[in-house]
């Protein structure tokens, strides 16, 4: 991993499959990653799942912080993830970044 990639701006994103499943990931470019997933060149978990919809994304800081946030989101229940999608809390990522900077 290059120094630039490690410290660039990373985003957390959530996609919904046609079956209603939610997928959480991180990337430096949400549009590019969406296109990769749609083309079947993204995560194996999404291959063959049909049309994907971006339902949430937010800035997550550097790669390390993005990975930590992704892990925390993946530990949530389906109903908790649905609440995130419904509420669209941009503060989720901001609060996580602030806690990291002050801690």
Swiss-Prot record:
Which residues pair up as cystines?
none
Q: Where are the transmembrane segments?
A: none
* Location of the GIY-YIG domain: 8-83
Which sequence ranges form a coiled-coil region, renumbered to this chain?
none
Question: What is the superkingdom listed in this entry's lineage?
Answer: Bacteria
Enumerate the InterPro entries for this protein: GIY-YIG_endonuc (IPR000305), GIY-YIG_endonuc_sf (IPR035901), UPF0213_domain (IPR050190), UPF0213_GIY-YIG_endonuc (IPR022992)
PANTHER family xref list: UPF0213 PROTEIN YHBQ (PTHR34477:SF1)
Q: Which family does it belong to?
A: Belongs to the UPF0213 family.
Give the protein name, as stated in the record: UPF0213 protein ECA0725
